[in-house]
Amino acid sequence: MYSLDWPRAYGIPNSTATFKLFPEDFQVNELFEGQFSGEGEHIVLKIEKRGLTTEEVVKSLARLINKPIKLISYAGLKDKQALTTQWLSVHAPGEIIDGIETLEAPGWRILECTRHNKKLKPGFLSGNHFIITLRNVSDESDLVHRIEQIKFKGVPNYFGEQRFGRDGGNLIKAEEILVQGRKVKDRFLKGMYFSAARSWLYNLILSRRVKESSWNLPLLGDVIQLVGSNSIFVNDKSMDEQLLQRIGDKDVSPASPLPGRSKNLVKGTALQIINDVYEEWSAWLDGLEKNGLEEAWRANILYAEQIEYRINQGTVELSFVLPAGAYATVVLRELVQY
């Protein structure tokens, strides 16, 4: 019912590769723009984990320091089948937890320890740095050609399959709540299911644009978003040359909606594409609006910055930086079949 094989911007890659043969083949490191204050109510820990989810590390840490899980916060979730570093914060006002800076357990360890005057939460991250190893690459020249393409043109900014749960399970739960009226008391789970539903509808809209080769073009009535910002404006011209240049300069991007109560910003051709999807999924849209979700916007174009690669006898190591909320797998799927 929920196919997650979205259309690609550059066609199906010629090259195949093996991905995630080992956790070290997918390395992720969180990036922050600012610095921690060095003082405050929150102990901030830089964690290295391997083969564990963020939630599993949080539970393990909570047991070791004898604290409720609710006192531990983070800025983002990191993959299980990976080697990742991320920051966790522990609310411990005026408290010293002996030995916390050297704690470790199977699958994780603490690399750094400091304090901060705010707890970590989504929005703190500026981005993530990825180091990815692809093994048994069958067509290195095709891979390199595609890397050069996406350096300048970017890729469709789909939500990755992780967003939807195993086998789309989060979408099944969302359907039960939004259409069948099932009650879910756990606010975290409910929010996760709603996020999956909105992401699904966003991907459907973006996939229509990819099929029509308009995902990176400013249609009449499009909402345009400044890259790296939530600032938006509406394009009231058809194929504005100045706007095309700004897209080429990675300054702005056409955007698609994360559904909710609408401010009716989008118009014209862009609105028709959105309405076609909303008409098909009207029950979901009604449910999201009834649950108080507000419409938001997400750029259509994802730019992978600081791309570097090394090739060694069929193995390719890729390194790049993505903004917070973006998925490395949507970059990889434009490069190789894995």
From Swiss-Prot:
Its EC number is 5.4.99.27. Keywords: Isomerase, tRNA processing. One of its GO terms (cellular component) is cytosol. InterPro entries: PsdUridine_synth_cat_dom_sf, PsdUridine_synth_TruD, PsdUridine_synth_TruD_CS, PsdUridine_synth_TruD_insert, TruD_catalytic, TruD_insert_sf, TruD_pseudoU_synthase. SUPFAM superfamilies: Pseudouridine synthase. GO terms for molecular function: RNA binding; tRNA pseudouridine(13) synthase activity. It comes from the Bacteria. Residues 154-303 form the TRUD domain. It catalyses: uridine(13) in tRNA = pseudouridine(13) in tRNA. One of its GO terms (biological process) is tRNA pseudouridine synthesis. Pfam families: TruD. The active site is at 79 (nucleophile). It is an enzyme of class 5 (isomerase). Responsible for synthesis of pseudouridine from uracil-13 in transfer RNAs. Belongs to the pseudouridine synthase TruD family. This is tRNA pseudouridine synthase D.
